[in-house]
Regions:
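Glycine-centered flexibility motif
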Residues: 15, 19, 26, 67, ...
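Conserved AdoMet/S-adenosylmethionine-binding subsite of the radical SAM
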Residues: 53-217, 222-224
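C-terminal accessory extensions appended to soluble enzyme cores
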Residues: 221-222, 227-264
């Protein structure tokens, strides 16, 4: 069985605002919308500042220490950090990120075209505690979003290839742009679109050729391997399949060991 990657231990999600709008095929079965629906929340497309979460990284315990310890912080996982409705709150969020230099903030977006206009004045070549990331689900999303992400200066550029709903040829853009890590996962939900193992291997081989770290985190609810379709796989089984395959490719430590995490 593969060793658990450095990023698969413990993390925290920070959702300073909640709510989003679907922008592409990868959003069809978004867990945020499905989760809100299961709780009877009917206005998931209304973006609201969180009353309880906004200042989470700055909250302190009775001893005056930060409640949120040095770790990886998955940012805006129930929205998009660069969504238009959050423009009036984002400067304050950047200030919080700036103050917590001991944490690493993973900022994942499907709106890379907005990143440049939403960066703080002192961004420079990037904050040392921020990893800018995009999610891509198919070839068109990859072709559109990777140049937009990598044209923005940052110390780390990552890609969450999830949910992977079709084959993606990555060589051409990896020849041109520096990507640090690709995390790949299938779609896990009722009526999930299948992920094919051949697609996974194709991305992995491209990562090896280009010196990019590759992590396969789940195979999806419906998974195809060798022409056989496996359906309705529970999330625990999906993770076991990935571990048994042992195909992660680690170029170097993606995260400090003190910031090991499970990425949603």
């Amino acid at each position: 069985m593969a060793d658990i990657p450095d990023f698969v231990k413990n993390s925290v999600s920070w959702n300073p605002w909640h709510g989003c709008h679907r922008v592409s095929e990868g959003c069809r079965n978004c867990y945020m919308f499905l989760g809100d629906e299961s709780r009877g929340v009917g206005d998931s497309d209304t973006v609201r500042r969180s009353k309880t979460q906004f200042d989470l990284p700055l909250k302190k315990d009775r001893k005056g220490s930060f409640q949120l310890k040095d770790r990886l912080v998955l940012t805006s996982m129930t929205s998009d950090f660069f969504i238009e409705e959050a423009d009036e709150w984002r400067d304050e969020a950047w200030s919080i990120i700036r103050r917590r230099k001991d944490c690493t903030f993973v900022i994942l977006t499907k709106r890379p075209h907005r990143i440049g206009a939403c960066l703080p004045p002192d961004w420079g070549d990037g904050y040392p505690n921020v990893r800018l990331s995009v999610s891509v689900e198919n070839q068109s999303a990859w072709d559109e979003r990777i140049p937009l992400l990598c044209d923005v200066p940052a110390l780390k550029h990552d890609v969450f290839m999830a949910p992977m709903i079709g084959p993606i040829s990555t060589d051409a853009l990896l020849d041109r742009y520096k990507v640090d890590c690709i995390y790949l996962g299938g779609e896990y939900c009722p009526n999930a679109r299948p992920c094919d193992y051949e697609w996974v291997l194709g991305v992995r081989e491209s990562c090896i050729r280009h010196g990019v770290t590759f992590h396969w985190r789940n195979c999806g609810t419906n998974f195809i391997k060798g022409g056989t379709v496996y359906t309705d796989l529970p999330i625990e089984t999906q993770g076991s399949i990935c571990c048994s395959a042992d195909i992660d490719h680690i170029v170097d430590d993606v995260m400090p060991k003190s910031r090991q995490t499970t990425l949603f």
